[in-house]
A protein has these predicted regions:
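Active-site nucleophile-adjacent alpha helix/oxyanion-hole segment immediately C-terminal to the catalytic cysteine
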Residues: 1-72, 76
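Low-complexity, intrinsically disordered short peptide segments enriched in small/polar/basic residues
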Residues: 3-6, 14, 107, 127, ...
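Short linear sequence elements within intrinsically disordered, low-complexity coil regions
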Residues: 11-13, 17, 108, 165-167
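Generic hydrophobic secondary-structure signal
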Residues: 27-33, 41, 130, 137-139, ...
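Conserved active-site-adjacent core of cysteine acyl-enzyme catalytic domains
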Residues: 49-134, 140-142, 147-149
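Noncatalytic regulatory segments and standalone regulatory/sensor domains
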Residues: 144-169
Length: 169
């Protein structure tokens, strides 16, 4: 029997808060990337991202949160994002664009949107908070964690992603 994405979220099955929640993809992705339980991530989203119960989080609010947490997270750099700045992310959100990647076809380089599947293959080490249009999820060591259908919906373009920096002790 395959492991569901919810099994990767600490305390999700036992959480009374989770049972009544909807539109909580940001909370679940935070729980996985922060390596904390669901209730802690729920409180974090409520206090730091002003998330109301059963409501989603605006994309710009997510960007502002991660911009304030620079010591813990780093914006993922790709061919289309050489500067790693929040303004770049803001531009892509406003323009509705996705991260780009290149591949070779018959000797020619072709630039295209980076899909969730390509992102998971390319960034197969580490913890990433990933945003696609209207949804947030986590990619941990190349494994897509979010809704139960997220691992099968890999053709969605990635808008932006943040990598959790490794703690140095």
């Amino acid at each position: 029997m395959p492991i569901t994405s919810f099994e990767f979220i600490k305390g999700y099955a036992q959480s009374k808060v989770a049972k009544g929640e909807t539109n909580d993809c940001v909370v679940r992705a935070l729980a996985v990337v922060e390596d904390c339980d669901y209730d802690t991530a729920h409180r974090l989203a409520a206090t730091r991202m002003r998330r109301a119960n059963r409501k989603g989080v605006h994309t710009l609010t997510i960007v502002k949160y991660f911009d304030c947490e620079r010591e813990k997270y780093e914006l993922v750099k790709t061919e289309s994002n050489p500067y790693k700045t929040p303004m770049f992310v803001h531009h892509f959100i406003v323009e509705g664009k996705a991260l780009k990647t290149t591949y070779k076809l018959k000797g020619k380089e072709i630039k295209c949107d980076m899909t969730l599947g390509t992102f998971a293959k390319r960034y197969n080490r580490g913890r990433y908070f990933v945003v696609v249009r209207g949804h947030a999820l986590a990619v941990v060591d190349g494994q897509i964690i979010g809704n139960n259908d997220d691992p099968t919906r890999t053709r969605r373009p990635v808008r932006f992603a943040y990598e959790a920096k490794r703690a140095t002790h």
